[in-house]
Amino acid sequence: MNKKVIYFLCTGNSCRSQMAEGWGKKYLGDEWDVYSAGIEAHGVNPNAVKAMKEIGIDISEQTSDTIDQELLQKADLVVTLCGHAADVCPATPSNKERVHWGFDDPAKAEGTDEEKWAVFRRVRDEIGKRIKTFAETGK
């Protein structure tokens, strides 16, 4: 059986889409090939790696990539995770489903180190919950 392809997109492929790829591989890996990319490639944020490691998901080997047009064409579902990607995302083929799941950008969190870290954990958990719901309901 061929797996479907899900493609998580955000602005820099640094935090949200990286965490989504990690969660996606955990919850969707049996039925979906899971990828992520960004309008730009900012490198994987070390705090995203740390936040995911804290809950037992290793994303340290994932790479920060710009959107691959061939993969975009192959994708069965494109999920944008932030406003910028939703606005600037390349056109997707009309037969491809595209949805937007908005999450705060933890890299832009302000405050003390402790407050910034709390945002990474919150966004990590929100993304995980959303992907788990999708895995269970298809929505």
From Swiss-Prot:
Keyword Cell inner membrane found: no
EC identifiers of the protein: 1.20.4.4
Domain of life: Bacteria
Annotated GO MF terms: arsenate reductase (thioredoxin) activity; protein tyrosine phosphatase activity
Any Pfam family: LMWPc
Location of the protein in the cell: Cytoplasm
Keywords: Arsenical resistance, Cytoplasm, Disulfide bond, Oxidoreductase, Redox-active center
Keyword Hydrolase set for record: no
Location (main, coarse): cytoplasm
Catalytic activity: arsenate + [thioredoxin]-dithiol + H(+) = arsenite + [thioredoxin]-disulfide + H2O
InterPro entries registered for this protein in UniProt: Arsenate_reductase_ArsC, Ptyr_pPase, Ptyr_pPase_sf
GO-annotated biological processes: response to arsenic-containing substance
Gene3D superfamilies, per the entry: 3.40.50.2300
One GO CC annotation: cytoplasm
Catalytic residue positions: C10, C82, C89
Family in the record: Belongs to the low molecular weight phosphotyrosine protein phosphatase family. Thioredoxin-coupled ArsC subfamily.
Its job: Catalyzes the reduction of arsenate [As(V)] to arsenite [As(III)].
PANTHER family, per the entry: ARSENATE REDUCTASE
HAMAP family tied to this protein: Arsenate_reduct
Protein name from the UniProt record: Arsenate reductase
Organism per entry: Halalkalibacterium halodurans (strain ATCC BAA-125 / DSM 18197 / FERM 7344 / JCM 9153 / C-125) (Bacillus halodurans)
Gene: arsC
